[in-house]
Regions:
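Solvent-exposed loop/turn segments at secondary-structure junctions
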Residues: 3-8, 33-35, 49-52, 89-93, ...
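Conserved beta-sheet core of the metallophosphoesterase superfamily
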Residues: 90-172
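Binuclear metal-dependent hydrolase catalytic cores centered on His/Asp/Glu-rich metal-binding motifs
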Residues: 22-24, 37-83, 93, 161-164
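Divalent metal-coordination and catalytic microenvironments
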Residues: 2, 27, 44, 88, ...
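Active-site beta-strand/loop signature of hydrolases that rely on acidic residues for catalysis
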Residues: 1-4, 82-88, 105-108
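Short acidic-hydrophobic surface loop/beta-edge motif
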Residues: 31-38, 139-145
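Core catalytic region of metal-dependent phosphoesterases/phosphodiesterases
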Residues: 1-36
Length: 178
């Protein structure tokens, strides 16, 4: 789920979960499913919250996390299967050293709309939650334990802050190969 869907849930204007399930969708918010593809297991999870908590010295601290979130992430990474986490906000893993803490093969993310405005030779101008001239607004990024993070520019725009300019919308297709 993204921030717009979370907003619908907060306003309680509709039974979004019920409508999604009725349409056949599987909602993976702090949840995961193991699926079989050509005799290989892939674990797919979903997370909107931040995947970190910071202690008094500014370091990643699993013990300071909300226990439900910590337990979900520890359970999610406890498999030999290939692990894909869908996390709307890339900052869920880039802040607080979370990308160097959790053992996840691939995080798929968006939220920053490619930086809204792309300046030639400089990249994205503004990324939600990352601020001005953000690093993680599109492309593939690698970390110590989160092996790959793909951040898509997506299709939308944050028209309240900046209109999308010089920033071609995208849908990312990922081919997984053994």
């Amino acid at each position: 789920l993204g921030n717009h869907e979370i907003g619908y849930l907060d306003r309680k204007t509709s039974d979004l979960y019920g409508e999604l399930k009725k349409a056949g969708a599987v909602v993976l918010e702090k949840n995961y499913e193991d699926i079989k593809v050509k005799n290989h297991t892939i674990r797919i999870g979903g997370l909107y919250e931040y995947a970190f908590a910071v202690d008094g010295q500014g370091k990643m601290s699993k013990k300071d996390m909300n226990s439900g979130l910590r337990d979900f992430l520890m359970d999610f990474e406890d498999t030999k299967a290939f692990k894909i986490m869908m996390s709307h906000r890339p900052d869920s893993f880039i802040f607080g050293q979370a990308a160097d803490t959790w053992k996840i093969d691939l995080v798929v993310s968006g939220h920053a709309h490619g930086g809204q405005v792309i300046l030639p030779g400089m990249g994205g101008l503004y990324g939600a939650d990352q601020g001005w001239f953000p690093k993680y607004v599109d492309g593939i990024h690698h970390f110590r334990t989160v092996k790959n993070m793909i951040v898509t520019r997506g299709l939308g725009s944050d028209k309240e802050k900046l209109p999308r300019f010089n920033n071609i919308p995208e849908i990312v297709v990922i081919d997984l190969k053994k």
